[in-house]
Amino acid sequence: VDAASLLDSAEQRIFDIRRGKNMQGLQRLNEVIVETFDRLDKLNSPDSDQYRGIPTGIRELDETITGLNRTDFILLGARPGMGKTSFALNIARHAAVKAEKTVAVFSLEMGKEQLCSRLLSTEALVGGTKLRTGKLEEDEWVRLIEAGDILSKTKIYLDDTPSITVPEIKAKLRRLREVDLVIIDYLQLMSSANRKNEGNRVQEISEITRGLKVMAKELNIPVLALSQLARDSEKRAGNHRPMLSDLR
């Protein structure tokens, strides 16, 4: 067992103690049934929204997946340049602004200022090019200031640490204590905490993915990870729709 694993285990135990988590073993089915019916009862109560998944802001998607639910690990795959980051930031913005959730965004590709500009652009309905050039009309300045005021009141946290590992993300989230949604952009830029896998990228990605799924369950939150898809699907005859095998 390496030092990173020991540190991660120790931090997890401290985190569990702070939350008063009772580490149970086997649990009889009748107890789980009672808990399940209790959850269903809460879902039908007047304040049911707090027990439902975090809304993405896309009605059709929310109706299909019932929002982003606790312990879910969601892998969002698309080819380069298809708008993965914009899509994920829209989810983050909606969760923070409309649902008043705490959102942590780990960006391994873009810096914090770039992410902030994108969030402001979307909230203010001002083109991203104008934010890059600074050539803004007076009404656009007004909308940007209003957007900045709205976003400043949210609990969106940005981290642009390059080549971050799963244990490092977990450590930062534990220090944050209260977090409702984690977004990672993107999976292939993360580093493995296990040196034994160095040089074997397939094993590294597999270990990182498994670690993120475990993290979602341990912290009891949804984790949305973006992933690049290989361009091989474009070369396939007939159906160009991406498949699981296109995850690289």
Functional labels for PLM-detected ranges:
Residues Q50, G128-E138, I156-P162, S192-S206, ...:
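Flexible beta-alpha connector loops of hexameric P-loop NTPases
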Residues G81:
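Walker A (P-loop) phosphate-binding loop of P-loop NTPases
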Residues I74-L75, A104:
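Short hydrophobic/aromatic beta-strand immediately N-terminal to the Walker A/P-loop
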Residues E63, H94-E178, S192:
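Cytosolic-facing regulatory segments adjacent to core modules
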Residues K84:
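Conserved lysine of the Walker
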Residues A78:
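The Walker A (P-loop) glycine that initiates the GxxxxGKT/S ATP-binding motif of P-loop NTPases
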Residues V1-R70, V126, E140-K155, P167, ...:
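Core recognition of P-loop NTPase motor domains used across DNA-transaction enzymes
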Residues Q203-R248:
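Phosphate-binding/switch region of NTP-binding enzymes
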